[in-house]
Design a protein with these regions (language model features):
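Pyridoxal 5′-phosphate
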Residues: 1-172
Length: 172
């Protein structure tokens, strides 16, 4: 059975992880997406363990988190100490916006059409005299490159919130 699974096209293997596709054509992946079967199973296993044993297996849970950090580090070619696990993208963006050592005159480049969680944290920095250069997702690459010179941070989504457009700005 596993061999047959491996011979399926990649999209079919992924699709089989999402039971919602058996009932719906699901297109709303912008903020809250359906859980893959394996994620739902892992969450259930964790909840059952916590329910039945309390914190007795806390060391195992921490080891699992460290394994995820290590896998993430390998994936992007970094060290696991550079990987933080957060609940969601919004929490991560807020942690970065609130956690960096911002000084008056520091510059951020951001986009007006962003999802609110990637807009308001940078907008809020303006009150701390951080300069935010607001661009449009339709600006040409040269304009974006120019704006990024000397900037401390570029806040850019891979998939555009309003249009769903997946930009490959770095590819020419």
């Amino acid at each position: 059975m596993g061999f047959q699974f491996q011979n399926q096209p990649l999209w079919k293997r992924y699709r089989s992880e999402f039971p919602v596709t058996e009932r719906l054509i699901y297109l709303n992946h912008a903020a809250v997406s359906p859980l893959p079967r394996r994620v739902a199973r892992a969450m259930k296993d964790f909840a059952d363990d916590a329910c039945e044993f309390g914190s007795m297996h806390y060391d195992t849970w921490l080891a699992a988190c460290e394994g995820v950090r290590l896998a993430g580090a390998r994936l992007i070619g970094s060290h696991r100490d550079e990987i933080a696990l957060v609940k969601n993208t919004s929490e991560g963006i807020c942690a970065i916006a609130g956690g960096l050592d911002w000084k008056p005159g520091d510059r951020v480049v951001a986009f007006r059409e962003e999802f609110p969680a990637n807009y308001y944290p940078w907008k809020r920095l303006e009150s701390r005299r951080v300069q935010v250069e607001w661009l449009s997702a339709t600006d040409p690459l040269d304009r974006i490159e120019e704006a990024c010179r000397g900037a401390k941070l570029l806040a850019l989504s891979f998939v555009q919130y309003l249009s769903g457009l997946r930009e490959c700005k770095g590819h020419r």
